[in-house]
């Protein structure tokens, strides 16, 4: 699950990992997401999310509904803000959480990364320098 655009593209690039697994997607209902995820099960979430209390409340309701319907064992996200309610509700429901910090933040954290870092089961970074910001992270290198 993640915002459309680059965040969703990062997740899609992990196709060798997820292609044979049961899955669903949560992202913005935008043309790029619909095109990329054609034929996939997709739930739309509310946007814009930029530091918006209204978006957080709406996406928390969506997260509650989707996660209670789907009951995932694992939630993976590359951000952005829409990940926060899904991760916290997912954690309460017993799902394992994997967060992949964005590629273009090398020496400082993202707001979403800061918010989900304490509850993730695996926090992945793409640069060794990011481990200074997230000491418990695992550096798997670039997704690209």
How would you label these PLM feature ranges?
Residues 7-19, 30:
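Short amphipathic alpha-helix
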Residues 7-10, 33, 83-86, 108-109:
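Short, well-ordered alpha-helical microsegments
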Residues 51-73:
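An amphipathic, basic-hydrophobic alpha-helix
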Residues 72-93:
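An aromatic- and histidine-rich active-site surface loop
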Residues 2, 20-59, 129, 140-143:
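Conserved nucleotide-sugar phosphate-binding/catalytic loop shared by glycosyltransferases and other
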Residues 95-144:
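Active-site-proximal region of nucleotide-activated glycan assembly enzymes
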Residues 3-4, 80, 101-104:
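Histidine-centered beta-alpha loop that forms part of the nucleotide-sugar donor binding/catalytic region
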């Amino acid at each position: 699950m993640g915002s459309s655009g680059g965040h969703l593209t990062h997740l899609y690039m992990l196709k060798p990992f997820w292609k044979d697994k049961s899955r669903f997607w949560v992202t913005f209902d935008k043309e790029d997401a619909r095109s990329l995820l054609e034929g996939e099960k997709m739930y739309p979430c509310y946007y814009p999310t930029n530091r918006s209390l209204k978006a957080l409340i709406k996406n928390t309701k969506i997260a509650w509904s989707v996660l209670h319907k789907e009951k995932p064992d694992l939630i993976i996200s590359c951000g952005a803000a829409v990940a926060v309610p899904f991760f916290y509700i997912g954690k309460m429901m017993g799902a394992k959480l994997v967060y992949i910090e964005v590629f273009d933040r090398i020496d400082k954290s993202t707001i979403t990364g800061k918010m989900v870092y304490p509850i993730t089961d695996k926090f992945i970074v793409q640069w060794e320098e990011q481990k200074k910001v997230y000491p418990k992270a695992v550096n798997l290198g670039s997704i690209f």
